[in-house]
Amino acid sequence: MDLVFVTNNDLKFKACQKILDVNLEQVKLPLVEIQGEPREIAILKAKDAFKKVNKPLIINDSSFCIPSLNNFPGPYTSYVEKTLGSNLLKLMEGNKNRDCYYLDILVYIDAYSLKVIETKTYGTLSLTEASGDYYPLDKIFIKDGDNKPICYNQGNMYENNGYVELNNYLKKRKVSRGIVFFADKVLLLYRKRLENNKYLEYYAIPGGGIEKDETKEEACLRELFEETSIKTNIITYLESEEYDTGICYYYLVNYISGDIKLGGEELEKNNPDNYYEVRLVPVSELDNIYIYGKGSEIIKEVYRKYKA
C-alpha cells in the first residue's frame, strides 16, 4: 500500500516509517490553520491535505497541554512554539505541578473513510531548557520514565502507540458490499450454519473481500455476480463500517440483468449445516430479522433517501 504522510517534521516521518508496513512518502505543504478543539482542527487539516494531494494520507497534529495552566497551550501549540518557545518555563515559575502531556491526533483519510486515533504521552516540564538546535518544546518536555528532555532521545522521541494502532487498522481485511433494491424489497444472503451444536441464522448484504489490485467498486460488482448471479452497476458509494477484524465499504447498486440465484463458492459449499440462500426481503420486515453489522440500519436509511 502507498501512503502519504503530510508533515514538515522529518523526525515524525521517520518514527512513523519504522512502524507502518506501507510505502510511506513524506509531503510537506501548508495546511489550513483554524481555532477550535484539537480533534476538529486535525480532521479539517486532513481534509484540506486530501483535497491537495488526492491520495490516501495521514496527518499527525500535536497539542502540548499543561493541566495546571488549564491545558494551555493546547490547540495553540504551534503558535506558542514559534513565539514563546521554551520561554514557556517562565510561566511555570513557582508552580509545583509541572505535569504535562502531548496529545497526538493521528488522522487517516482516503476517498472512502476517515479514521481518527488519539494518544497521549505524559511527562513533566524540566526546570531548565536543554541546549541544542531542537524544537523548543522538545527541549523542556521530559517523558515519563526518562530523566532528560526528549530532544536527547532522537531515536524514539516521536514514537507513539497511535502509529501501531494505525498499522493494525491498515492491515484489516477490506470488504465491499452492494445494496440492490427490487421495488420495496432488498436482495440479501440468508445464512444458517452450525456452530457449537447450535444453528445460527442471520442475513448479510451480498459482498466479500477485495482482491489485490482490485478497486472497491470492482470487488462489489464481482462479489454480487458470484454470489447472486446478477449483473449490476454502481449508483453511489454510501459509507464504511469498521469492526474488529475488517472494514466494510457499502455501495448502492442498480440491477442490470440476470436471474437471481445462488452462485460461486457459496453454491459449492452449500449444505444443511452451512446453508446459503439468496432472498428478496421486504424492507418493511427488516426489523424482524438480524442482518450482519450495520446492514439493517444502512438499508433503511438508503431506502428512505433514494427509494421512498
Model-derived regions, located:
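Anionic-ligand binding patches
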Residues: L3-V4, L11-R173
